[in-house]
């Protein structure tokens, strides 16, 4: 018994002749999305803008004498967020130039990618090996690195995202010097985490 010719339906033969369309379309879609994501992560990083501090109660962080050398670090919690205070070698956008040529910057330690904690990575070779990031000759200094997905933030550039999946800079903490002590008096809002 044969089927009538000229039927407009999808026959088994036609289906088998065109089965390849599905995996090709899926592969093209996957590669298209990966290309979009890679370009967004590589070229879509936001620069550091003017500080947008929200006032918060003053909190003593450290004495200036505790930050006696460049890249001295004090970790603290402010506005329910883990943060870090750094003595940096030059003025930083959103940082503080304290008396005696002391330059300070403080950042939230919550990575702007998925919220893991960032830490100060002092050794450029560790950044190159563990984070697959080698800074240029002018940026051979400690960086803030997230070990979850290997994002790197430059404290000298105001916490700007330099490498990895994070596209937004770290929120900055407003600093003040009162006498010989450093205080936090405000913090930038936490960004919506990226994916």
Where are the model-predicted features located?
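Residue-identity detector for glutamine
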Residues: 5, 59, 90, 138-143
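N-terminal pre-ligand scaffold of iron-sulfur
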Residues: 17, 23-24, 34-134, 171, ...
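A general structural-boundary detector
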Residues: 2-3, 98, 133, 162
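Short Fe-S-cluster ligation motifs
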Residues: 137-195
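C-terminal single-pass membrane-anchor helix
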Residues: 30-31
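N-terminal secretory signal peptides and thylakoid transit peptides that target proteins
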Residues: 3-26
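Residue-level marker of regulatory loop/turn positions in helix-turn-helix DNA-binding domains and
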Residues: 8, 99, 138
């Amino acid at each position: 018994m044969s089927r009538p010719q000229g039927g407009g339906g999808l026959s088994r033969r036609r289906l088998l002749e065109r089965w390849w369309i599905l995996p090709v379309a899926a592969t093209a879609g996957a590669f298209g999305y990966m290309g979009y994501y890679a370009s967004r992560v590589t070229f879509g990083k936001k620069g550091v803008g003017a500080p947008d501090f929200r006032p918060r109660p003053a909190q003593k962080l450290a004495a200036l004498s505790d930050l006696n050398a460049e890249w001295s670090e004090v970790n603290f919690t402010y506005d329910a967020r883990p943060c870090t205070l750094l003595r940096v070698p030059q003025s930083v956008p959103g940082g503080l130039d304290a008396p005696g040529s002391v330059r300070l910057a403080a950042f939230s330690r919550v990575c702007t990618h998925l919220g893991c904690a960032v830490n100060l990575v002092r050794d450029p070779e560790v950044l190159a090996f563990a984070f697959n990031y080698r800074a240029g000759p002018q940026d051979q200094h400690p960086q803030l690195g997230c070990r979850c997905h290997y994002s790197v933030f430059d404290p000298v550039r105001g916490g700007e995202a330099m490498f990895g999946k994070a596209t937004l800079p770290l929120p900055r903490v407003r600093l003040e010097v009162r006498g010989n002590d450093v205080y936090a008096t405000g913090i930038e809002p936490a960004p919506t985490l990226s994916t």
